[in-house]
């Protein structure tokens, strides 16, 4: 008997699809080459993308929802999590979970802490204590899971929290203390050991957010000829969980992070199980249900390919390039590095009132470099964020970047700073974000330089200047409206 033939399903013309996708990508910033100094991470290793893409494609249809049907998911995840645990101070009792990214890892850390505080200490009104420099993902987690955020100021020059200040903010209702290794905005490592010890004294969990730098820092300390970073991982007494993204300095495709716990019992508090319905029994280790195993397989393949020796050398190069960059910025008139970065993230501010860092960013973008603007907040002046990755970690590439940056400052100084009409600031200060209607929102966006269709101008300095002048709560009200204009069907 012949095999049944598949039905003749009508298909659209496929020949043009690759060209259509390429046309869409043409408007994006490049993801290779190191010129996009935020959001993307490039190892600069030939063939690595193709290896990852092949692994991703092989497992794209595998559903991580049910590991009894797809046991390969268990093997892959255990090996990836085990690799992270071995690097970052894990021991025999360490457990972990593979997640879709840093935000999900942070969300799960907070959820786990909330459940742990409720079940073990009877906490009904949980709080999360963190430095003002902690990542926004923790504020998102507190919003979603009903925790009160207690922020602690940082030193105005080092941008590092004082352990005594954070310890003083801990109460009987604290479910979680958070420290960064490093902080995203300034690249500094908080006093992990001191904060973890203070938290342990009160029976409070302590999470280390090493999402952006953990993989780099862990391998950097394996390099023999460069200084190791301060202690920051699970080997530090009192640290109960740690998040590390593989799609950052692990250079894997997007959608790969690991959340480590001191033990499996703590991890269990963040899992969800449900059998009180007529369908299949559900157990979720992450916030997702159905999830493709593609990102997991791609991460597994890249970690195997690069290996410990490869990552150690990449981290060594990134460290040396970062030091070269910091020293070079110190020689550019009008620019200064904020704090003393412990990792590969550098925040560059202006000490010249005639030099606007946001105008510098526009000038750099016109030359093919993206430096991420960071508005002034809580004592941190307006600045530009630079993430140094392996693709730009060569002396000649850093020299090229410094030359472009020096030239951009000259042009930006000639253009002058972007001003904001004081009347606009006064008007904004009088607005109540909670009562703004559609017309007021539209007017506020127009004041910020955003058109009715959500299109942004080529030069963003004027928009950033206005947003920086607005109260943060008003900005938080306007940003979703802006996205609503962009993500619209008509």
Residue positions per predicted region:
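Active-site C-terminal subdomain of aminotransferase-like
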Residues: 227-344, 348-353
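Conserved PLP-enzyme active-site core in the AAT-like
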Residues: 47, 100-285
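Short loop-beta-helix segment that forms the pyridoxal 5′-phosphate
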Residues: 84-108
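Non-catalytic terminal extensions of PLP-dependent enzymes
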Residues: 1-34, 38-67, 71-74, 78, ...
